[in-house]
Amino acid sequence: MDEGLSEAVKEIFISLYEQDYIYKGTRMVNWDTQLKSAVSDLEVSSSTENGKLWSIKYKTELDDYIVIATTRPETLLGDTAVAVNPDDKRYSHLIGKKVEVPIVNRMVEVIADDYVDPEFGSGCVKITPAHDFNDYEIGLRHDLDFVRCIDFEGKIESKDFIPNNLHGLDRFKARKEIINQLDNENLIHSIDDHEIQIPRGDRSKTILEPMVSEQWFVKTKELAKKAIDVVENDEIKYIPKAWEKTYFEWMYNIQDWCISRQQWWGHRIPAWYDSEGNHYVGRDELEVRSKNNLSDKMELTQDEDVLDTWFSSALWPFSTLGWPNDKKDLQKYYPTSLLVTGFDIIFFWVARMIMMGIFTMNEIPFKDILIHGLVRDSQGRKMSKSLGNTLDPLELSKKHGADALRFSLIEKANPGQDVPFDEEWTVAAKKFGNKVWNAAKFVHLYTDELDSYELTEIKCSENHWIINRFNQTLEDFNSLMITYKISDAYKTLYNFLWADLFDWYFEFAKTLISNDSSKEETQKTIKHIFLKCLTMLNPAMPHLTEEIWSSFNKENLIDLSWPEFINTNHDEDNYVEHLKEIISSIRNFRLTYSIKNSTTISLFSVKIQEDWFTTQLSSLVNAQIEDINGLNNEESTTIFQSGKFKFEVVASEYFDKEKEVNRLENKIKQLQKSLDVSKSRLENENFMKNAKQELIDLERNNLDSFSEEISNLEIALNSLKR
């Protein structure tokens, strides 16, 4: 409804009208009696429901009767014919004869039409051209009268030919009255259970009423042809490709688009009427008068209807970029490369954007269309108010942050697959955001003294390692994004940031920065890589990354180029991986035997050439490196080894061996009991049959966790018993 977008809507409407794509006509439409507005075919949600099939007797002029089957007896008030199949010999003698419509006592003709299915019901159908889409077409073919018996509020018309007791009744209450009256007159032949397709409005959920109404329409056949061609020629691609079939099915069967709505809010139709009902289209009343040479004395009234929401939405790719006035952004960003959307609005929005983009710009609006699934609840059920499982994204954003919600959905959503959303994902994403925020503080703390952070020569193995890990992450990320595996791409970035950069490299960096010879190189490496990662993270966490970026730089992060690889020539990355493995083993050693971090551990080893290796080891696990020759060969040791690096520790120096053996044995017994309980539950048929899936999954996770912990403790126990 912004001024610029409103102007774009007017321009497109006028352009379509002047090129004979928009017209005003009387046609059958889906009418929402609650919204009191026409709705387009695509806003109709049809479902199969249990209903009734009434077979009703219609008297013939031959003093006999025929049986008519209908699911909507209330519409017989508007019947203007009875139809049979021309090949149905049972009724050939009645074609051209008259029958009497019950209750209204209207004499109508029996007509022959191929539409009638001889196998359905009695093979005779009532024709109500004013209240049924198929009957409407039959009415046009046979030049029948269109008699409206239901008004725009869904009530029976107060007309002379309709009995007074039905005037103003709701259509469904009238149905009951009509059935009772038919039954009293012995005109009900039979009533059978029958499955019916019920059309409801997408928004109101009200059963829609087919109504003949004067509305504005867009001719779509020619527009659709061009929109079909660009997809068939691979100018526009659907991902997954299977959605092209859905697109083509809709487009090849497209009908003229009803674009007028009888609502208060929306873009008002730029058309004016004179006292005789003639309409004039223009940007405003002054233009209408000038263009059509209308006198200032002639009274004009603007159309009170507004345009379908999807009409203005169809202009989104170019109207939001300044069209038709400011075209600077339009020239830069149109067409865009990718549209990400849900399958449920492929025709509502996607197809119409393609049609309007080609019509207006003579160019496709986007090149690729990535279709994601529906967001469901954690159990995979569709969200609905009746189930009480709906989640308000605004409330989630207020509670956890918009970036946390955005990242959690991006990380979990795969193309074409539904997302069983769990709020815990957003909680985890919020923690990740906090981790990034704290990482920014770390980077500021250690790098703010730098005048420049451009990398030159890299000497430290730890810095080479993190640069190579970044390059590999960037390569993997780019490859995944190119193929639109966006979820996998951000999982890759998440793992690099949390595990490699924050958990490992930042710890290495503290040691390096404490040494003057490696300080500046490490400071530059930290800042260089962290800021590149912010750029990669920006599409998934725009608010957080822009805020952090602004604390380092003046320009907007979103305007920057995508990160490039960092040049490095170093092949000692595996040494850092060996270092990580040994550090992890020693930390597990402390944890297993309850050795405090403040306790210095003596590690015995042969002379290691890589001083940086032992420096990091000493710093990160509070270890003192000793010469292996100082180790008593008779003492039992625990060995930590990875690649060529080997360290031994005399475990008994740090705890009472006998007490530790008893502690481990008792711990294993406790865990074994817990494991047996989980195993018993999972082997219980009643539990597996009746328990909720999340409880079953929890028990399976417990079983795996207990098994792994027991295995680790048994290894430690056997080591002590050697």
Predicted region positions:
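C-terminal low-complexity, glycine/proline- and small-hydrophobic-enriched intrinsically disordered tails
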Residues: V427, S550, E555-R722
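Core structural elements
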Residues: K431-H444, N463-Q472, K491-T511, S678, ...
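Glycine- and acidic
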Residues: E119-V125, K159-N164, E232-K245, T301, ...
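Alpha-helical recognition segments enriched in aromatics with Gly/Pro capping
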Residues: H142-G154, Q262-G266, P270-Q417
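Acidic, turn-prone loop/beta-hairpin segments
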Residues: V29, T33, V39-S45, Y273, ...
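Conserved phosphate-binding loops in nucleotide/dinucleotide-binding enzymes
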Residues: S47, I127-A130, F172, E209, ...
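NTP-handling and nucleic-acid-processing catalytic cores
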Residues: M1-E153, K159, N180, I228-S260, ...
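Catalytic adenosine-cofactor/nucleotide-binding cores of aminoacyl-tRNA synthetases and other
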Residues: D202-S204, V375-Q379, M383-K459, N553, ...
